């Protein structure tokens, strides 16, 4: 997001460093998913440890009231405590994604904040940009606040923002790959140009990946596999919380310039012994 490129002053406490998505404002810049955990208990414990405020839910794969005979995720992740972010994971065309968002709005009593993802194929889970653009327009016209999963193409990101998407969510690398941020330069271009929040979505594997995303100037990071697939998900959730915080603080502080040659830390004059 372009207005985040200046460094913070000492009069800007990090505790007051919020960000706004559509009509909602948040303090935690870590967003988490709910899939791949071994059970509901682990899901709740890990999400609690992350201190996330936004929790994303795959409507086509997770019961949030569609089936009264199955455990309801909302019994563990309460909408009274978290902002539930329905997503369209598993959708491969605009029509299915639109229908899924409308179902989510019905199940959540008119909730209009959604995460749109329209996938290209099952092997890469790379975004289908054309179908994403098509779905985004319909949803925005229908009153949804759309956070959108997309490629790392700065031109596509600008188009989605121009359409009215409230957050741009470029992938760091393939969903669930844990490969980290393979595209830092293009991510930086998206961040510099954007006037809405930019959040890395997909590819984070460990805490350093999250910190790097925030150091680049991202407004937040969304992850699921990096926590759920860890040997200790609750501990990893805590690590990610601290990594996002540290990366954001480093960005606001302003890193030192990179130099090709050494620069001594101590003065080069006034030696005791010549």
From Swiss-Prot:
The keyword Cytoplasm applies. Catalyzes the rearrangement of 1-deoxy-D-xylulose 5-phosphate (DXP) to produce the thiazole phosphate moiety of thiamine. Sulfur is provided by the thiocarboxylate moiety of the carrier protein ThiS. In vitro, sulfur can be provided by H(2)S. GO terms for biological process: thiamine diphosphate biosynthetic process. Belongs to the ThiG family. Homotetramer. Forms heterodimers with either ThiH or ThiS. It is found in: Cytoplasm. Pathway: Cofactor biosynthesis; thiamine diphosphate biosynthesis. It is an enzyme of class 2 (transferase). Its EC number is 2.8.1.10. Coiled coil: none annotated. Keywords: Cytoplasm, Schiff base, Thiamine biosynthesis, Transferase. 1-deoxy-D-xylulose 5-phosphate binds at residues 176, 202-203, 224-225. The active site is at residue 115. GO terms for molecular function: thiazole synthase activity. It comes from the Bacteria. SUPFAM superfamilies: ThiG-like. This is Thiazole synthase. GO terms for cellular component: cytoplasm. It catalyses: [ThiS sulfur-carrier protein]-C-terminal-Gly-aminoethanethioate + 2-iminoacetate + 1-deoxy-D-xylulose 5-phosphate = [ThiS sulfur-carrier protein]-C-terminal Gly-Gly + 2-[(2R,5Z)-2-carboxy-4-methylthiazol-5(2H)-ylidene]ethyl phosphate + 2 H2O + H(+). Pfam families: ThiG. CDD domains: ThiG. InterPro entries: Aldolase_TIM, Thiazole_synthase_ThiG, ThiG.
């Amino acid at each position: 997001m372009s207005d985040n490129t200046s460094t913070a002053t000492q009069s800007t406490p990090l505790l007051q460093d919020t960000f706004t998505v559509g009509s909602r404002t948040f303090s935690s810049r870590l967003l988490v998913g709910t899939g791949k955990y071994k059970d509901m208990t682990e899901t709740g414990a890990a999400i609690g440890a992350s201190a996330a405020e936004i929790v994303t839910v795959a409507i086509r794969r997770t019961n949030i009231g569609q089936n009264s005979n199955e455990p309801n995720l909302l019994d563990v992740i309460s909408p009274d405590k978290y902002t539930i972010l329905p997503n369209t994971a598993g959708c491969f065309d605009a029509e299915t994604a639109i229908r899924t968002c409308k179902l989510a709005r019905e199940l959540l009593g008119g909730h209009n904040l959604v995460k749109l993802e329209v996938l290209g194929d099952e092997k890469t889970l790379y975004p289908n940009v054309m179908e994403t653009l098509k779905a985004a327009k319909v949803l925005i016209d229908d009153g949804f606040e759309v956070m959108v999963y997309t490629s790392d193409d700065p031109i596509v990101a600008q188009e989605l923002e121009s359409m009215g998407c409230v957050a741009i969510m470029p992938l760091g690398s393939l969903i669930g790959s844990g490969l980290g941020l393979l595209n830092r330069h293009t991510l930086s271009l998206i961040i510099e140009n954007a006037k809405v929040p930019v959040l890395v979505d997909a590819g984070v594997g460990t805490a350093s990946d999250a910190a790097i995303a925030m150091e680049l100037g991202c407004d937040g990071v969304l992850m699921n596999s990096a926590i759920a697939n860890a040997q200790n998900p609750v501990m990893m959730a805590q690590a990610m919380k601290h990594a996002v915080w540290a990366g954001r603080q480093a960005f606001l502080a302003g890193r030192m310039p990179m130099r090709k040659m050494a620069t001594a830390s101590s003065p080069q004059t006034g030696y005791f012994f010549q």
